[in-house]
Regions:
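Cytosolic juxtamembrane N-terminal segment immediately preceding the first transmembrane helix
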Residues: 1-32
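Central cavity-lining transmembrane alpha-helices of secondary-active solute carriers
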Residues: 66-84
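Intracellular juxtamembrane helix-capping segments at the cytosolic ends
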Residues: 45, 133-156
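Symmetry-related core transmembrane helices of the 12-TM Major Facilitator Superfamily/SLC fold
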Residues: 190-209
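Glycine-rich segments within core transmembrane alpha-helices of 12-TM secondary carriers
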Residues: 149-172
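C-terminal ends and interior cores of transmembrane alpha-helices
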Residues: 100-115
C-alpha cells in the first residue's frame, strides 16, 4: 500500500525537470524552519494559568527556555543517527517520517499545554520535532545536491534560504494564531500548536510526495 514511498519508486521518469525539486524542498524548508521561531511561545507558556500575568503555578521562563535547545540537540543527533537510513530509504519515505515527527511534535506539545505537563512539550517540540527537523533537513539537502551536482552551492543555498524563511513566516503566523485563539481564560498556545501541526503536516506531505 505504501510501496510508492520506497526508494525505487522515486526514480524520475523521462522528461522530468530537475527544477521541480527545489520548490518541493522549499515546501519542507518553510515548515521545519519554524523551529527558529519558537521564542514567540516562551512568554505565553509562562502565563498558561494566569493568562494575563504569570501565576505561581505557571512555568518560569528558565524552564521553557530549554525547549528550543532540545530541538536543536535532537536536530543534530537525528541527522547523525539517521543519515545512512535516509540514503537507503530514499527522500520520499524519509520526508514522510520527518513529517510525522515534526507535525506530531506539535500535537504532543499541545497535549502538554492542556495537561500542564512541561515534559510533554520537551518530548513533543524538543525530541519529536527535533528529530523531524534533522531527518527532514538532511533528506532534502542530499536530494538537492544529487540533482544539482554541477551547482552544489546553489543547491545548499536554496535549502538554507528556505530554512531561514520558515522562521520569518513561522513567527508572525504563530502570533496570529495565538491571538486568534486567545480568550479570557486561555493564551491560545495549545490551539496554535494544533493548527500549526495540521498546516505544516499538510504542506510537508505535499513537498514529500
Amino acid at each position: 500500500m505504501l510501496s510508492f514511498l520506497d526508494r525505487e519508486h522515486t526514480v524520475a521518469k523521462p522528461g522530468f525537470s530537475r527544477w521541480m525539486v527545489p520548490p518541493a524542498a522549499l515546501f519542507i524548508d518553510l515548515c521545519i524552519g519554524h523551529a527558529y521561531a519558537f521564542s514567540v511561545f516562551n512568554l505565553p507558556l509562562t502565563k498558561l494559568i494566569g493568562v494575563t500575568a504569570s501565576a505561581p503555578q505557571d512555568w518560569t521562563l528558565a524552564e521553557v527556555g530549554w525547549i528550543f535547545s532540545f530541538a536543536m540537540l535532537f536536530l543534530g543527533s537525528a541527522s547523525a543517527v539517521f543519515g545512512k537510513w535516509v540514503e537507503r530509504a530514499g527522500p520520499r519515505k524519509a520526508m514522510v517520517a520527518a513529517t510525522c515527527c515534526f507535525a506530531g511534535g506539535f500535537f504532543v506539545s499541545a497535549l502538554g499545554v492542556v495537561t500542564h505537563q512541561l515534559w510533554l512539550i520537551y518530548l513533543g517540540y524538543g525530541v519529536l520535532g527535533g528529530c523531524g527537523l534533522g531527518i527532514g533537513y538532511i533528506s532534502h539537502v542530499s536530494t538537492l545536491i544529487k540533482w544539482f551536482p554541477d551547482h552544489p552551492g546553489l543547491a545548499t543555498g536554496m535549502a538554507i534560504c528556505g530554512f531561514g524563511g520558515g522562521a520569518m513566516i513561522g513567527s508572525p503566523l504563530s502570533v496570529l494564531l495565538m491571538n486568534y485563539f486567545a480568550s479570557v481564560d486561555s493564551v491560545g498556545v495549545a490551539q496554535a500548536f494544533v493548527a500549526l501541526g495540521i498546516i505544516y503536516g499538510l504542506f510537508m506531505t505535499i513537498g514529500a510526495i
